[in-house]
Amino acid sequence: LSKFDIIGGGDGDDTVSITGHDGVTALKMSDLQLTSVETFKVTATNNKVININADSATPSNFITVENATTAKTTDITNLAAGSAVTLENTVNGQTIGVVTLGLKDPSGSSDAITINVNGTSGQGAETVDQIIVADVETINLSSGSVGVTPMVASDSNVITDQSYSTATALNITGAANLTMSNAIVGTVLTTIDASAMTGNLALTAAAVVLDLKTGSGADTLTFGTTLTVDDVIDAGSNPSVLSVDSLSATINELGTSAA
């Protein structure tokens, strides 16, 4: 795909896909002649990084595919507020590396983006090393599956580290299990709402006062020494006695929590 190709998507939800991407130099979306294309899907060349400059009117959705390579970075800059980025992990035993997302215009006070983390059914733990987002106030994070075959109970999307420096709200949804290994870095984060999530959620909370809600899965919440009287926790309803939520913390101050 080059700047000389002209693609018009017309009506509907249209996707343009490329393979063999080598992100040594950023792919500039403004160089491409795409109209009415909603989604752009990129599969890297084996052992190469993904690097996209999203400064363009279209598309607003990006899909990146991990290509049999461990821990290669993904950088998408100049995103518009409201954009969606999907990270597809398709190979067992390989991880997506550090993912860094940034907006073109960071001046807004209520900017949101959506991040979809999708793993492959039957592959066990599918890992993203780290997600870094700045200049965004609301992160909508979804845990799902690649393709139409859902991840099974023994599978989980895993995000080792997360840094959301300006986010005040993190909304989590999805039917696939999700593990957040290390504490979320977010000094102004006040709300984590996973009440709509049906998969199991394992979360290590940020070291801030939180209003935290989880969904109908068997959720595991870890607070360490950060749980205080000001935290509000609602672990949601569970569909059976076999689906049990758990919370661990070294308690300094404790008020009322709901489980």
PLM features per residue range, with description:
Residues 1-259:
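Solvent-exposed, low-complexity segments and loops of surface/extracellular structural proteins
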